[in-house]
């Protein structure tokens, strides 16, 4: 569905989508092979959009892609590990979600379209953190977001995801790379 994109751009979009799915509330669902940039092509090399009745050649998983796309595979592992580690990504009720998730506003916290940013107030949900910020940038350029508080630990960026702190941002303004997700914890 994006024929003019480079492989690097497709991988960035894959990471962005995985980040959205695995930081969202509710049950996460990932198709088999997404973590290896799985595609389904027919015998002529054309992309098969609906492979339900296609052959095993189209539908099988090519495990050698796990080696080729090791960085993407590790990114998925990191997102899954982060989701398991922090209960704030897995609230139990609609009321709990409404009470503890607060969306940042365009014109106040950021100026771009195609951006979603929210803070999870985790202090009553998760003993491991006070707050989690999730910023989703679908733009083709980097954007700045004002989080209103400083001293955040970056856990997910455009390259890395997991339970290890990537960097600490002392300022309240956070830069988010193009076509990426950033998750910060305090």
What are these regions (language model features)?
Residues 1-149:
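Loop/helix patches that line or flank the sugar-binding groove of alpha-linked glycan CAZymes
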Residues 2-8, 162-173:
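Short, polar loop/linker segments at the starts of domains and inter-domain junctions
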Residues 57-60, 89, 160-164, 182-183:
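Short, surface-exposed, polar/charged, turn-prone segments marking secondary-structure boundaries
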Residues 98, 156-157, 170:
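Intrinsic disorder/low-complexity signal
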Residues 137-138, 158, 186:
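Residues immediately flanking
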Residues 149-162:
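Solvent-exposed beta-hairpin/edge-strand motifs
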Residues 167-186:
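C-terminal beta-strand-rich structural cap/linker in extracellular carbohydrate-active enzymes
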């Amino acid at each position: 569905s994006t024929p003019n994109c480079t492989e690097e751009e497709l991988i960035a979009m894959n990471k962005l989508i995985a980040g959205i799915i695995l930081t969202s509330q509710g049950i996460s669902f990932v198709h088999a092979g997404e973590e290896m940039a799985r595609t389904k092509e027919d015998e002529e090399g054309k992309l098969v959009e609906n492979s339900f009745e296609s052959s095993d050649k189209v539908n099988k998983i090519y495990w050698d892609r796990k080696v080729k796309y090791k960085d993407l595979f590790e990114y998925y592992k990191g997102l899954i590990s982060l989701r398991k580690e922090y209960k704030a990504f897995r609230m139990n009720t609609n009321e709990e979600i409404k009470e503890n998730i607060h969306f940042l506003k365009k014109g106040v916290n950021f100026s771009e379209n195609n951006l979603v940013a929210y803070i999870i107030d985790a202090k009553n949900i998760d003993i491991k953190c006070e707050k989690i910020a999730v910023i989703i940038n679908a733009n083709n350029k980097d954007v700045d977001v004002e989080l209103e508080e400083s001293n955040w630990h970056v856990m997910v960026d455009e390259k890395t995801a997991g339970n290890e702190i990537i960097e600490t941002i002392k300022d309240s303004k956070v830069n988010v790379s193009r076509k990426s997700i950033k998750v910060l914890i305090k």
